Amino acid sequence: MFASLWSVESISGKLNPNKNPQISWFYVFFPAVIGYFVILTGYINSKPSTGTIEILHPSFSTLIYPNSKMEIIASGSVWSEGPLWVEDESTSLGYLLYSDTQLNKIFRWDEGKGFFTVGKTLHSEKSGCKIDKGYCETMHEPGPNGLLKMNVALMPITSQKSVDLLVCQHGERAISLIKENGSRILIATHYQGNRFNSPNDLIWSPEGNLYFTDPSYGLMGKDGINVKKEIQFNGVYMIRKDDISESILTGLPTKNVILLDSEMSMPNGLAFSPDFSKLYVSNSDTENGYWKVFNVSPNTGALSNGRIFYDANNLLLLEKEKHGYKENYGNPDGFRVDIYGNIFASGPGGVLVFSPEGDIIGKFHLDKPVSNVAFGGDGRLYFTVSDMIVRVFIKAKPVRIISSHFLKR
């Protein structure tokens, strides 16, 4: 085969394409094919950009790249929420999980490692409400919300590579463990004998305790008839790691749920400061939106000295006036904190970036309301934006809890 393509000089022994017209054709055609393939893959993998980025303080320039653009990587959701980046040790790549509170599903988005983007796939169905429960189909948002990877220190029989999730379930009005094999365990369902409203977001503390919020969004029915509210406030709670472990072992939801705060009207997103001495919580109320900060006891994990970190009511009013009071263009919602204490928060008009002192240093302006944000292991920040997923390259790095912390304390 090769002899028919290549002519060999009898004296030098060198390959000479000029002696064979087939080789001349090969030298022209092959680079053209490669070039076409590169252009084709670039076109197929290209993603539309959206929104604008505004620098309000020089410090924000150190967190983003020049000429950064936000790009839409997935669409087709109804209300996307709960973004969670998962490192896949088997492929040395990561992927994004996110929930849809109205479709009652968890989706997965992969970049992939081949020539073409893998994109969006279904990760878990009926992940917020079981279909055999009659009220699921009557609820406005029966699905899952916040997602959190289960720590293996609390599940000694689980492999480090296993992706077991703690899920805030609106329809079940519970926090549940959904294992990678599809089995489920209810971790917590009640506070003092009363059913939760609709758990919204959740995070780990370094000690392995679980903090979560429980507003009442998930109680809304499609026909205007809401599910009965059993707890007369919307709270911020904690479950200690030993009680989580016991719940997993027994298969029964824990009764040891600790109320940390009951004063916020709609507690939603929450995150710790880099040294874990403070807890930030957003209040996602269109009539009284703000971010609050609490001191965290290093001994008990209890909260104290709650005060307003940033009052969002003026921003909410501006957005209402801008859009003619017709739609909601973002309340204080989910957020993340970087290693320097900057807060990347979904809020009025897009994603606001706060300094640790509470000043807005930058904005990611978007034309649709943003529900939450997540740091990716690929150097990007991911946004759940109404019916789509958006990402942008950033320099900021997330605060991380090392797994060994759970074992030491």
Which residue ranges define each predicted feature?
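Residue-level detector of intrinsically disordered, flexible termini
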Residues: F2-A3, S7, Y27, P31, ...
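Bacterial N-terminal signal peptides
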Residues: P31-I39
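Sequence-structural signature of mature extracellular/luminal beta-sheet repeat domains
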Residues: G42-R409
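N-terminal secretory signal peptides that target proteins for export/translocation
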Residues: M1-P21
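N-terminal Sec-pathway targeting helices
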Residues: K19-F29
